[in-house]
Amino acid sequence: MVSIRPDEISSILKQQITDYDQSVNVSNVGTVLQIGDGIARIYGLDQVMAGELLEFEDGTEGIALNLEDDNVGAVLMGEALGVQEGSNVKSTGKIASVPVGEAMKGRVVNPLGQPIDGKGEIPTSDNRLIEEMAPGIIKRRSVHEPMQTGITSIDAMIPVGRGQRELIIGDRQTGKTAIAIDTIINQKGQDVVCVYVAIGQKSASVANVVEVLREKGALEYTVVVSAGASEAAALQYLAPYTGAAIAEHFMYQGKATLVIYDDLTKQAQAYRQMSLLLRRPPGREAYPGDVFYCHSRLLERAAKLSDDMGGGSMTALPIIETQAGDVSAYIPTNVISITDGQIFLSADLFNSGLRPAINVGISVSRVGGAAQTKAIKKIAGTLKLELAQFDELAAFSQFASDLDEATQQQLERGKRLRELLKQAQFSPLNLAEQVAVVYAGVKGLIDEVPVEDVTKFAAELREYLKLNKAEFIEEILKEKKLNEGLETTLKEVIKEVKSSMLATV
């Protein structure tokens, strides 16, 4: 017969009592009442927060947007083929966040920060909320450093500074993305982290951009966030905020960052789709009343931080697509009023062969002038005015038969200036090259060069400087100003290149 050992039994009971966990897992659970078009109406979830992440039975995630008396309206971030009426939904108690850090560089991710480039998981433990408060006034300082785009017409006439929001606006197929990609390529060696956010683009277009960045060696300091045209509206809506969060991480570490939102028109359309399906009241052009806030809270996150905050910066280049050049539509006017200036691309100029097709007359940079380098500021001061006057005179001269000599001279110089500012795609110029080219045009040193040879002259001038006057380029890149000695050297070089070219013409 087995003997009973009370001491052993009591010790086991004590151990069991000690190990007993009284905590209860309380989760807020609801039931799907209605589902369709990427929207779910859910009964229950009384404790849910606005913007909280929800988890459906099949693992699909959603975001609670409408908190009504008897139900919650949520948008789904995926196809959610397994979700149906009666499915259970659980609130997570979390707001959407995204992985951030050095490991993100060179990767292509979706708006949830998940890699979509086939290179495996991203080894980072840092996370950041997708929606963050913009830095306040005390945390900022005024824009004072240049963000060189490498595009002469922009750096000379519509300069962009670090921490600025400069809108790129124009019809489809006018070279908006090309300007943004050129700017990313030009940041090579500048210790700037770039984030390219593609919203509602064709997957082939995004793959093409990634390939160009890889070829030019720019992917190593760039993060690409892509929400394709086939993705859920909720993901297209979230993509820009994800890009801002990734850039913010580096900004608060004291680094300079550049974010391209390509383009916010498609984000606004995705938000309109979600809002109408959630039965929010429509406003102008059927957009919801808070579409302005949707863009303003995103673009206000771009800033130049004060030295106490580390001195980092986030420069934003949002892109807006217009219909037939109509900048007075709802979304274009909204974003123009939020940003610190706009670069307007004209379809007519593009079709006439002017690339980049920048309409200088209505393009403006409201704060970039303070950040422009002394070298380019000194010589490009009159460039914008001269080109604007040229456009006016060119239109007028079509109807006038006899023009006085001064007007003819102005027209001739304007034609040459316009030719000088033409630039091939993916070939950004450094500051010294820009200074040389603009100086030659503004000072009238190429008035004798035939208009059709101006582009060739500019290329030969740059080549000559690289081969024979490397110290000139180094000096300007180092000092960022054009002193008398450098100016004399430049005049001699221009004269030499011009005479050798005219001799062969």
From Swiss-Prot:
Its EC number is 7.1.2.2. GO terms for cellular component: plasma membrane-derived thylakoid membrane; proton-transporting ATP synthase complex. F-type ATPases have 2 components, CF(1) - the catalytic core - and CF(0) - the membrane proton channel. CF(1) has five subunits: alpha(3), beta(3), gamma(1), delta(1), epsilon(1). CF(0) has four main subunits: a(1), b(1), b'(1) and c(9-12). This is ATP synthase subunit alpha. The gene is atpA. Keywords: ATP synthesis, ATP-binding, CF(1), Hydrogen ion transport, Ion transport, Membrane, Nucleotide-binding, Thylakoid, Translocase, Transport. Coiled coil: none annotated. PROSITE patterns: ATPASE_ALPHA_BETA (PS00152).
